[in-house]
Amino acid sequence: MDSATTIKQPPPPEAVVIQMVMGAWVSKVISDVTRLNVPDVLKQHGSMSAAEMIARHGVEARPECLERALRACASLGIFTESATGEFGPTKLSDALTMDSPVSVKKLVESLAGSWWKVWTGLCDAIRTGEPQARNQLGMEWWDYLKANPKEMEDFGEAMKSNSLSSMKGVLEKCDFTNSKKVVDVGGGFGHLIIALLEKYSGLRGTVLDVPELIPIAKKNIQVNDPGISSRLEYIGGDMFKSVPPADVYVMKHIIHDWDDGRCIRLLRNCHQSMTGDGRVICVDAVLAPMGDTAGTPAKLLDCNMMVFISGKERTKVQWDELYQAAGFQIHTITSLRDNFGTSIIEGVKK
């Protein structure tokens, strides 16, 4: 070996740990630059300096401070950076724009707002076993959303962007050809139901969610095709009390929001209202079993459930226990192979 050859040594353990911990800084700088609308400005108008963004396109910031934040983002690959101080769009920044077909803008912006506040209580959640939304926001998370319509609307948009791959998975992996009616429990704005009604002309669909969300959903979703609108309904209600009759119930990122007792109650409601030889289809993470260290994002999502609400992500064994307790048995588990270990857990009556 040439004596001049440099052998790259792995970073020391403390450097690796510090890099991990700095992930909080990464999240915050990307989220806040997105809230300042920089990705949209660059997509629409092309490369420019921080000063130009402020002077010509209404970005509210101090030039030097914005430039420093943009340089940090450029080093992460979010933007390009020239020697003359101009920043440009990339494929990554496009995902942070409002009109991107894979937009995560609202989700990323939410992470910089109230979500960030609640996460400061993680240590207390670990110590006490209690969710920390009340301590950080003054009320429980779901009550906070009800009391803040704009936050609820943003949350709905965030969940839409967060569930695009899940929605695609349901459309591709689940067959509704012989189904008559599907209820999307906790269905938010109704994007999944509408997509199903577009694909299956003989299907009827219901979105069940909290009453406070229904007018927001109807405002945000305009269905101009009478062939679809005539088969679509929105119902405001309490899923823990009852669910509308149907032969298929879909719950996309719903079960992980709740403790085992409430999940079993919800699944039993579906069991009792289910018509014919129906199905329940849950879309959520399936955690790796103990001893398997794979699936970091899903395990971080599990911590997110812990600090916010009384929910959690579950292993295959835990999913089976929930279904069995509610009168179902797991028929299939189909992995969507995304970062969060999301799977479609389909159950039938025992």
Positions of predicted regions on the chain:
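A short glycine-rich, Lys/Arg-flanked "PGG" loop and its adjoining helix->strand segment in the class I
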Residues: 264-276
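Core SAM-dependent methyltransferase catalytic element
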Residues: 328-350
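Short conserved AdoMet
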Residues: 43, 175, 200-201, 275
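Short glycine-centered segments of the SAM/dcSAM-binding site in methyltransferase folds
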Residues: 181, 277-281
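Class I SAM-dependent methyltransferase SAM/SAH-binding core
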Residues: 181-183, 188-241
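A short SAM/SAH-binding and catalytic strip from SAM-dependent methyltransferases
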Residues: 245-262
